Amino acid sequence: MIIADLKNIAGRTYPARRLTQNLVGGASPIHAINFSMGNVTLEPNGGQVPWHNQDQEEIYFIVEGTGEMCLGEEKQTVGTGQAVYIPSKVFHQLTNIGSTPLRMIYCYGPAGDVAHWRQELDGTLPRAGIEAPPLPKGAQEQCTKKPGDNQ
């Protein structure tokens, strides 16, 4: 039996003010063929999973907190206990709009890394409305900071 214990997974911090801890896949001791899963903590007041897309379909489950979810041309507020289905290749973004951390579980399939992790760390994330489709009207701005930027 293989067990991944969240308290023993350091995870990775991203410029958009979030911590991602892989529970299945990545640095986790658990690896699956058909899906990857992890825990994400978005810092209060703007922590974000920036506007991106990927080949895999995905689910975000909000464990606690309040966020603005953008999916394609749609924008909605999501909160504790809600799940969002993200179809393959559709651009999406989740921003913490609350004053407390937002925690969510992601699950996507098939398993594997997704390009936006590396792009964000390299500062090469496609920018909304330039290299990527625009965000929905009135959405929180996409974070495209590079590691070390203090902006």
Language-model segments: what does each one mean?
Residues 21, 69-71, 104:
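Short hydrophobic/aromatic-rich beta-strand segments that constitute the beta-sheet cores
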Residues 46, 59, 66-68, 75, ...:
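Structural motif
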Residues 19, 55-56, 74, 90-91, ...:
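A generic "binding-loop/recognition-motif" signal
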Residues 34, 39-44, 53-69, 107:
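Short, conserved beta-strand element in jelly-roll/cupin
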Residues 1-35, 50, 118-151:
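A short, N-terminal "cap"/entry segment at the start of jelly-roll beta-barrel domains
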